[in-house]
From Swiss-Prot:
Biological classification of the source: Bacteria, Bacillati, Cyanobacteriota, Cyanophyceae, Nostocales
Compartments where found: Cell inner membrane
Name of this chain's protein: Lipoprotein signal peptidase
Species this chain originates from: Nostoc punctiforme (strain ATCC 29133 / PCC 73102)
PROSITE patterns hit by this protein: SPASE_II (PS00855)
EC class of the enzyme, as a word: hydrolase
Segments passing through the bilayer: 7-27, 38-58, 68-88, 92-112, 125-145
Membrane topology classification: Multi-pass membrane protein
Amino acid sequence: MRLKNRLFWIAAFIAFFLDQITKYWVVQTFSLGQTLPLLTGIFHFTYVTNTGAAFSLLSGKVEWLRWLSLGVSLVLIALALFGPTLNLWDQLGYGLILGGAMGNGIDRFVLGHVVDFLDFRLISFPVFNVADSFISIGIVFLLIASFQKTPTSTGRLD
């Protein structure tokens, strides 16, 4: 039996694995609050925890966000298993979002917070993590997919 939406599963696994391995490295290497300038004043690794969503939105809403992460993950898994065969961009987009949602969701359930460490100081951007990056990239891929879909004679998008 061939796995449907294979690229979805590959993207989800890679995103989840890279997120978890980088967070593990940060927790094992840094003290909370410690920073390592890679490009001083521009880009640092800074170990912080976040009880909110991506980029510290909804800070302090851990309980609600852990269930949201689980719900999003279950819906995306159901889509890939029981939905139609998705096009390339949809598979990549949904897969990256699943990997990121699962990565941050595991943190929320196990730790009660998310580990963040990517710190772009040049633009004063909130510290974030690899999962947040994959979720954002996944959304961009879904936008690309939406522009490639054309209406059929019945008015439906293919």
